[in-house]
């Protein structure tokens, strides 16, 4: 019985990429089986309450997967989203996460997190889902990310926002309509317009 349960835990870790205690509860498995697998080296603790099979192929964006698992309400944004989409030369030391304005900040995350709060409409707009290391990660689209960079230019720097805009226009020719739509949602049309005209 115990051996069968530990096999199920390992299978769940391989299927989901990263597992949490709530994933075990949902599958009807006890946490003690994780401890047995940890002791045998068949599973590894990658963060507080986060476990993965050691044979799991790890991507360069594993931090996004682990933080998304720890904070499912959050959306990867700003510098982290720019890095994911290849729109910056920046290497953020924190995972940037957008939360709705009334949401609680995640208390326990496996990596340092920088939180920004958005209105409900701005938070919902432009979300894409990507699978990273077997985990579904909510991340803003490239156009929404660029608009957010102008909205939070005082936090990340106007130079980063302008670099992101230029890189976006090079990679996404004809993507100005989407960019302008998100600029309206984020209320940064006036701020962004001169940079958009200069880059065109």
What is each PLM-predicted segment?
Residues 3-27, 33, 38, 46, ...:
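Nucleic-acid-binding surface
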């Amino acid at each position: 019985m115990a051996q069968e349960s530990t096999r199920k835990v390992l299978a769940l870790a391989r299927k989901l990429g990263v597992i949490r205690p709530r994933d075990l509860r949902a599958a009807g498995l006890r946490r003690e089986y994780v401890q047995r697998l940890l002791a045998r080296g068949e599973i590894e603790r990658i963060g507080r309450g986060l476990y993965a099979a050691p044979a799991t192929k790890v991507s360069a964006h594993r931090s996004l997967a682990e933080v998304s698992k720890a904070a499912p309400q959050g959306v990867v944004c700003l510098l982290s989203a720019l890095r994911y989409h290849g729109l910056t030369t920046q290497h953020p030391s924190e995972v940037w996460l957008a939360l709705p304005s009334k949401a609680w900040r995640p208390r326990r995350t496996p990596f340092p997190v920088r939180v920004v709060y958005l209105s409900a409409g701005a938070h919902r707009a432009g979300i894409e889902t990507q699978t990273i290391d077997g985990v579904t990660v909510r991340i803003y689209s490239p156009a929404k990310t660029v608009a957010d960079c102008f909205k939070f230019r005082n936090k990340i720097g106007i130079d980063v926002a302008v670099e992101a805009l230029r890189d976006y226009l090079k990679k996404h020719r004809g993507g100005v309509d989407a960019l302008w739509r998100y600029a309206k949602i984020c209320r940064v049309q006036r701020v962004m317009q001169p940079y958009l005209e200069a880059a065109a």
